[in-house]
Amino acid sequence: MAKLSLRNVQKTYAGSVQVVHGIDMEIADGEFIVIVGPSGCGKSTLLRMVAGLETITGGEIHIGDKVVNNLEPAERDIAMVFQNYALYPHMSVYDNMAYGLKIRGMAKAEIAQRVNHAAGILELAPLLDRKPRQLSGGQRQRVAMGRAIVREPAVFLFDEPLSNLDAKLRVQMRLELKELHRRLGTTSLYVTHDQVEAMTLADRMMVLNAGRVEQIGTPLEVYSRPASTFVAGFIGSPPMNLIPVARNAGGDTGAQMRVVAKEGEAANATLGHLPMGLHLPEQALLGLRPEHIEPCAAHEAIAEVDVRVVEALGADSFAYGSLGGQAVVVRLDSHAHVRAGDRLPVTSSAEHLHFFAPDTGKRIEA
């Protein structure tokens, strides 16, 4: 195991197209880090630079105490698990897991010990004589992970390993990955576009957008205090509501705010008590998680939501509607009697209000 350091890491392609912009991160020995972001944000490129499959055009990558920029992948003491398994179809499960050790010249007894140990961890022991075509998708992915485990690397790299699995298998494999990391304690860097995977697996997560770091933190920190409107809209399902607001006429900094209605709409919403010490500009974006917009009695309401659609999902329901013409989502108790066409009185607590600068999208702190 080893710590992993990314220091001003950059990637520029021919024609001065920069796709990774000066990324810095210190990853502790044994930490599980998830890089999450939309397609094309640079997350797989960053992972491939750590692996040695892409050249680095700026900065340094340290694995342990070594700068690995110019080392071949085989010299970096890493093991990588890919999205598409990359198994040899003519080889058995045992031989797929053992192949990398064989070409390194390891003794047969040591290979057998490592393969059998990994197979026991991953519940693959009964399948060691099978070919990949005889396995389910989840079993194939476990073989790919077993092939990485037998190398006993300093760092595991995962490139969207669950993307090819169906929804039920993804949940199962998430749990298995979490348990595997708990048992092995190996430093891990995991790439995904799926924010649920990021939230459930990560010790800390890095949110990437267009090759730049938007935020680094624990899943709870990122969810509870998003650093930008991008993070607020990307992390969470449904995402955070973002509503334009303005200071009431005549109010000074920190005064009441009102929702800015779309033309021809009446917002009828004034935010009463803003968080202490919060200084807001004339215009801002208000962020509210769907679970923090609470249905209430009419006399307690700060706004009314015009409900268009209600989705019943069992334990929860979601009401999709508008507030002054601005789209909002409200999470409801499954027993709430709300229907399309209702005007739903709602309120919220000051500690659940988030504010962002409309020009930069950055969080406004108290």
UniProtKB/Swiss-Prot annotation:
Pfam families: ABC_tran (PF00005), TOBE_2 (PF08402). It comes from Cupriavidus necator (strain ATCC 17699 / DSM 428 / KCTC 22496 / NCIMB 10442 / H16 / Stanier 337). It is found in: Cell inner membrane. Part of the ABC transporter complex UgpBAEC involved in sn-glycerol-3-phosphate (G3P) import. Responsible for energy coupling to the transport system. Residues 4-235 form the ABC transporter domain. Keywords: ATP-binding, Cell inner membrane, Cell membrane, Membrane, Nucleotide-binding, Sugar transport, Translocase, Transport. It is an enzyme of class 7 (translocase). The complex is composed of two ATP-binding proteins (UgpC), two transmembrane proteins (UgpA and UgpE) and a solute-binding protein (UgpB). One of its GO terms (cellular component) is ATP-binding cassette (ABC) transporter complex, substrate-binding subunit-containing. It catalyses: sn-glycerol 3-phosphate(out) + ATP + H2O = sn-glycerol 3-phosphate(in) + ADP + phosphate + H(+). This is sn-glycerol-3-phosphate import ATP-binding protein UgpC. Gene3D superfamilies: 2.40.50.100, Nucleic acid-binding proteins, P-loop containing nucleotide triphosphate hydrolases. SUPFAM superfamilies: MOP-like, P-loop containing nucleoside triphosphate hydrolases. ATP binds at residues 37-44. Its EC number is 7.6.2.10. GO terms for biological process: carbohydrate transport; glycerophosphodiester transmembrane transport. Belongs to the ABC transporter superfamily. sn-glycerol-3-phosphate importer (TC 3.A.1.1.3) family. It is a peripheral membrane protein.
